[in-house]
Amino acid sequence: MPRTADTGLEGRIVDAAYQLWSQGGERALTMRAVARTARTTTPTLYQRFRDKKDILELLRKRAQEIMFSYMRRAHSAEDFCLRYFEFALKHSNEYELIHADWVVRLAKEEPRPSFELLKKSLADRLGGAPEEHAGLALALAALLHGTATMLLTKRVPERISRELRHACVAAFETLVENAAGRSFRPNHHGAARR
């Protein structure tokens, strides 16, 4: 009797890989560990995925969806910042996965749901089309990412963590308020404007 295909196998593989990445980051994600956690064999894994990069791309997309679910509930600039930090701190390995080559993906114009949401939120608040606010959104994203990176540093004292968050929120709100009075344009015509 011929073997029947396991229709849920690919989903189990991605779930297993995501679990491994969430718990241990890149060092935990080996093809053997994924196969073992998904209750399959390494050759079966390679039949469905060429290499680790294929799996990482699916994991990145899932992490982006989870981050987007955090960000889309924001109802103010401050809330947007705080939700960003909450995601980064609660899901540090996923945050790393999303941002590892974010600038490269920006240049390739690959999907970045939370960044697109930020541009849309700026357009809703300031008027105009989302793409008109790409430069401001890029500046705000850099501000958020820099602050989140500092917050993810081991042993950050709570007082410093609070000060970093407060300073970032204040700078974020100031940039948005200043943009309300005039058009924010970066000094270059690079990928952020496309």
Regions found by a protein language model. Give the residues of each.
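Amphipathic alpha-helical packing segments from all-alpha helical-bundle domains
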Residues: 103-139, 162-177
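Alpha-helical DNA-contacting segments of helix-turn-helix folds
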Residues: 21, 55-63, 71, 98, ...
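Amphipathic C-terminal alpha-helical segment
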Residues: 97, 141-159, 174-185
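Generic hydrophobic, amphipathic alpha-helix propensity
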Residues: 9-17, 34, 59-67
